[in-house]
Amino acid sequence: MLMSVSILCLFFLINPYQIMIYLMIMTLFLLAKGLINNAESFINFFFFDLMSLSMVILTVWISILMIMASKSNNNYKNKIFNFYLLLMMNLLFICFMLENLLMFYLFFEAVLFPIILMISGWGSQPERIQAGFYMLMYTVFGSLPLLILMLLKNQSLSIIFNEWLFNEMGFIFFLMILGFLVKIPMFLFHLWLPKAHVEAPRAGSMILAGVLLKLGFYGLYRFKSFFFLDLLKFSFVLIVISMWGAVLISIFCLYQNDIKSLIAYSSVSHMGITLAGCVTFQLHTSFGMLMMMIGHGLCSSGLFCLKNMIYERLHTRSIMMIKGMINFPNLSMWWFLFSIINMSAPMTMNLFGELFLGLGLMKYSLLLSLPVMMMIFLSACYSMFMYSYINHGQSWMIFSNKMISMREYYLMLLHIIPMIMWFLKINFFMKWI
């Protein structure tokens, strides 16, 4: 019934406020259903567990915030833009609940097309076509080996895998998980992400950083039981590349002049430590991975919103040009809050996420202590660098007379509240473990 309502809304719900009401009702329904029954299977190939619940709620929440954020520009009244937005939300909604692995793969790839169309059609620069092309090539060709092997080894559309299929695959194992590593994105496969973020409209950056990057972790989590032995064998290689990349990208963030690129590269850094923790298969890291996915999704979405609030008034993304925001205390307060959340300050989910990921990695090998501490330290450095450059100093630009609206205040507040509430309800995530 819920899926039929979602499909009908794709064609008949054009007013964004009606969409928001529909999404809020769906969120409440999922919360009530998920808290009452933590795992169930229905309609043969749909499956609903705590991780699915968390990802679906995050998807719906970010979609609501996307609609609120798009109200200030012409996209708000664009029916095609609203259609792509709601289509992508429904594709994600189905993807996070599918139990059939072939169907999961199809929806996993189908989610790409709405975001590529949003980047190519509503991006602000001519380079948006190149950004969409990069994203398409990396993600589609990265996941083709998985589809080919699935079809070669099993002719049934049910895709019930046999144990012998995934024993001692060696190099083929990397080809199978390449599609997930590109989506995360893992260091060395991350070049598409900064381009996509820089050229995407505000709503596109929000859903890309908030939800789409988590699809890679979700797919890895769903498929890990099929190549568990290979993951154990090659996990150290993935951990070393991920942690080394997280440290290098964190250093690179300190040299960024474009604020949107800085936020995009910080996402790559945080996803690096999350991937490293994911492949250790420990209770600490499983708990930290889920919290980091949700906390980072809300934090990065909020940072892109803040960036756009400044861009609408100063028409520049250069950190060297954006200065003196402390003269606008309300705006400066939001920058301070999201900067400390980005560096995993207390009272947020990111703190526990990085804490459990770090503990799990150190338990896996003490040699990882140094890169973990370096990554956490550098994360604090570039977050402080971003806040201090934006808020202090003499501004080179004339700030627009356009005041911060109540809609924008609510938008920022709705990013903060879930992180604090979930921080106070940590035992909700422990049910997954």
Swiss-Prot record:
Enzyme class: translocase
Keyword Cytoplasm: no
Principal subcellular localisation of the protein: mitochondrion
UniProt-listed InterPro entries: NADH4_N, NADH_UbQ_OxRdtase, ND/Mrp_TM
Alphabetical UniProt keywords: Electron transport, Membrane, Mitochondrion, NAD, Respiratory chain, Translocase, Transmembrane, Transmembrane helix, Transport, Ubiquinone
GO biological process: one example: ATP synthesis coupled electron transport
E.C. number: 7.1.1.2
Protein location: Mitochondrion membrane
Membrane topology: Multi-pass membrane protein
Catalytic activity, reaction form: a ubiquinone + NADH + 5 H(+)(in) = a ubiquinol + NAD(+) + 4 H(+)(out)
Membrane-traversing stretches: 10-30, 45-65, 80-100, 101-121, 132-152, 169-189, 203-223, 234-254, 261-281, 286-306, 331-353, 366-386, 410-430
One GO cellular component, as annotated: mitochondrial membrane
Pfam families: Oxidored_q5_N (PF01059), Proton_antipo_M (PF00361)
Keyword match Glycosyltransferase: no
GO molecular function: NADH dehydrogenase (ubiquinone) activity; ubiquinone binding
Family: Belongs to the complex I subunit 4 family.
Role according to the record: Core subunit of the mitochondrial membrane respiratory chain NADH dehydrogenase (Complex I) that is believed to belong to the minimal assembly required for catalysis. Complex I functions in the transfer of electrons from NADH to the respiratory chain. The immediate electron acceptor for the enzyme is believed to be ubiquinone.
Name the record gives this protein: NADH-ubiquinone oxidoreductase chain 4
Species of origin: Rhipicephalus sanguineus
Lineage of the organism: Eukaryota, Metazoa, Ecdysozoa, Arthropoda, Chelicerata
Gene assigned in the entry: ND4
